[in-house]
């Protein structure tokens, strides 16, 4: 397990969504999504990250991306219905980035929610 | 007091959880590997209890870990010669050779009454396969989080994943080990590397038969395993049958997914820049790294234990076994390979 604190604390406007994810709204209506520090600690040292395909739309919870640590694969879905805009290539190339900097360089993907209000409805505490 | 009762007494109270046990027996590779995916969906929906599946494949096949790349992992010449299917599992870990001399156990369970998932569940549930093996005369131990070993040699590989709203843990016991197939199936950048890989597999992977001189019957192993889950305080189980919806889902969705070439050939993961061109985990911390040497047509091969280089080779350019030259420790070439290994994330 990764026990070191995150090197970069959450920035302004970063909110939890669901038990494992955070999101940060961008000016263009998209949101950046990542794994919370607590979730990356639970997962342990990540060996693989396969991001969701940019341009593809998913329903909330539908398996869209995967993470692997210690031979255990988590198949994760998007927190709300939406379309993936980008996947973080740095996290795919070096999944350890997610452990080292979960709120910064280790973001997972950027998406455009189908119904922006869905995010607000599911929003957790500000991190 | 039976062996299992002695274990139960040492572990504590009788487990309250009642699971279903599906024994698929000998069956084709897709069913042996992937029926549990169909089961997981029923478990997640609350249609059936958490479930233990046992099975024995009736033919050999190659199983890719979920994040492994078919095009980068598998030697196509081997596939053409052996004509075996390649199946991608939804769980983690590396590429494995599976055949009728291996016995499978698989768990599909809900988070709320089975466990949170993740590597800690591997450690918890694998107490039972260890206990069953020991009662049948195999002195297995758990090398956390996911290998059963005898001494330092792997006799069982295990992995897990979250699928369709449930958790799946899969594992198998090596009754006999086909070391040649295990090494020949791997795609390698130079033929001289294959003998090095085979030797390391022979050194690190053992089998039930090699350790004890004989093999218990599948049924005896299965029954001991079922009892061990109870005796270890994990769950009791009752024999059951697949539901019609599980059979239908398996035929129409699970099998179709595994027969779809786009599922087998998921795109390879992006690679970090650096000298490592091939990373082969053999067992636990043991493996090989193949490295490119800048400005030459040679490759370096490091046989590693974690980040420690145990042996190093310079490979190429001649083809065949003659292409590999073992490097003496203390030489510049050895040191160069050791430096590259130290800077690599390894088998994190």
Summary of predicted features, one role per range:
Chain B
Residues 2-73, 77, 89, 189, ...:
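Active-site loop/lid in soluble adenylation, ligation, and acyl-transfer enzymes
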Residues 41-43, 52, 75-76, 94-96, ...:
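A generic local secondary-structure boundary/capping motif
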Residues 47-51, 58-60, 81-84, 100-101, ...:
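Short coil/turn connectors at secondary-structure junctions
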Residues 70-71, 111, 318-319:
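Short, surface-exposed beta-strand-loop junctions and turns on beta-sheet-rich folds
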Residues 83-103:
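Glycine/serine-rich anion-binding loops at beta->alpha junctions
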Residues 89-95, 113-116, 325-326:
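A short glycine/serine-rich beta->alpha loop
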Residues 96, 100-221, 225-228, 253, ...:
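Catalytic beta-strand/loop module used to bind and position nucleotide/cofactor moieties
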Residues 188, 196, 297-326:
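Intrinsically disordered, low-complexity regulatory segments enriched in Ser/Thr/Pro
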């Amino acid at each position: 397990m990764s026990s070191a604190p995150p090197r970069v604390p959450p920035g302004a406007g970063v909110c939890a969504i669901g038990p494992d994810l955070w999101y940060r709204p961008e000016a263009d209506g998209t949101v950046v999504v990542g794994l919370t520090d607590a979730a990356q600690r639970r997962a342990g040292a990540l060996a693989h990250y396969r991001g969701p395909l940019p341009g593809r739309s998913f329903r909330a919870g539908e398996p869209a991306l995967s993470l692997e640590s210690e031979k255990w694969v988590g198949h994760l879905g998007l927190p709300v219905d939406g379309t993936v805009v980008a996947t973080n290539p740095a996290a795919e190339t070096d999944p350890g980035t997610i452990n080292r900097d979960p709120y910064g360089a280790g973001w997972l993907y950027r998406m455009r929610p189908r119904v922006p209000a869905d995010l607000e409805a599911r929003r957790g505490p500000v991190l | 007091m039976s062996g299992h009762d002695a274990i139960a007494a040492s572990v504590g109270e009788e487990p309250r959880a009642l699971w279903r046990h599906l024994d698929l027996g000998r069956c084709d590779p897709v069913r042996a590997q992937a029926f549990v995916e169909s089961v997981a969906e029923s478990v997640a929906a609350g249609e059936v209890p958490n479930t233990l599946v046992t099975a024995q494949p009736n033919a050999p096949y190659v199983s890719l870990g979920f994040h492994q790349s078919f095009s980068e992992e598998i030697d196509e010449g081997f596939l053409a010669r052996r004509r075996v299917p390649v199946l991608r599992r939804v769980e983690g870990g590396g590429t494995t050779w599976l055949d009728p001399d291996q016995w499978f156990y698989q768990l599909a369970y809900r988070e709320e009454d089975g466990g949170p998932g993740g590597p800690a569940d591997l450690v918890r549930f694998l107490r039972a396969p260890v206990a069953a093996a020991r009662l049948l005369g195999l002195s297995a131990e758990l090398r956390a989080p996911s290998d059963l070993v005898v001494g330092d040699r792997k006799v069982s590989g295990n992995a897990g994943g979250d699928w369709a709203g449930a958790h799946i843990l899969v594992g198998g016991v090596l009754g006999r080990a086909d070391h040649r197939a295990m090494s020949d199936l791997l795609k390698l950048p130079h033929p001289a590397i294959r003998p090095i890989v085979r030797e390391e597999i022979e050194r690190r992977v053992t089998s039930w038969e090699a350790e004890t001189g004989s093999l218990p019957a599948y049924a005896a192993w299965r029954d001991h395993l079922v009892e061990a889950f109870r005796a270890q305080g994990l769950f009791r189980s009752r024999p059951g049958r697949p539901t019609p919806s599980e059979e239908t889902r398996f035929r129409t969705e699970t099998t179709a997914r595994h027969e779809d070439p786009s599922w087998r050939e998921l795109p390879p993961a992006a690679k970090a820049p650096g000298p490592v061109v091939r990373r082969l985990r053999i067992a636990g911390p043991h493996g090989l790294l193949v490295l490119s040497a800048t400005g030459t047509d040679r490759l370096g091969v490091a046989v590693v234990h974690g980040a420690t280089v145990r042996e190093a080779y310079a490979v190429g350019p001649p083809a065949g076994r003659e292409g590999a030259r073992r490097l003496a420790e203390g030489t510049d070439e050895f040191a160069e390979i050791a430096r590259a290994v130290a800077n690599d994330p390894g088998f994190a």
